[in-house]
Amino acid sequence: MAVSFALFGTLVDADLPSDPAAAVAAELRERGVSVPPDFGAIYRETHVDAPEGAEVPLPAHVSAALAARGVEAPNNAARRAVVAAFDPTVWRRNGVEAALAAAREHGPVAVCTNCRVPELARRALVRADLRDAFDSVVTSAACGWRKPDERAFRTVARRLGVPPAELVHVGDDPATDGGIADAGGRFIDVRGTPLSSLGSELEVRP
């Protein structure tokens, strides 16, 4: 068995921007980019034609949104602006230590998170003092697939050296984290099983 955890809302909370488009626009201006007046609207539109289930990293989306209005973002400005816009304070949720200890008793442990922002997941783990707590960290931006697509979970299972059917995924959103079932694994919802009670739940074989 191996165990993976969702990150935001499961292991940690973070004060992420309430208006991501405005936050990114402000950072783009700081880097000399001429932000279109309707950036908030085009930020919410699709600009990159990706396969179903695939992730489009946020810097690529922002660059494409700007290009749709004929605006260039030189010197990697889109990526730098995105990274700066998502620079939150992070804190652990209750029960994390107990949950990780329980998971470790069963095998390797990973993070599997839908995260479009480069560096954000690892930065959050560092700030929550969880940098060395995992055998692998799989983000949608890096692996190319968003939960609930089963390919995201298959990536985690492969990194941890287990068949997907032996992967237990712990998360807070059945609509995304529950996709582990399509890969043959098991979903544990922290809304019904608190992290502090994960150990006893892992002992139950479905």
Question: What do these predicted regions represent?
Answer:
Residues 49, 85-87, 108-109, 140, ...:
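Short, contiguous strand/loop micro-motifs
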Residues 51-52, 86, 111, 143, ...:
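Short, flexible active-site loop motifs that bind/organize anionic cofactors or intermediates
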Residues 75-91, 96-126:
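Substrate-recognition element of Asp-dependent hydrolases with the DxDx(T/V) motif
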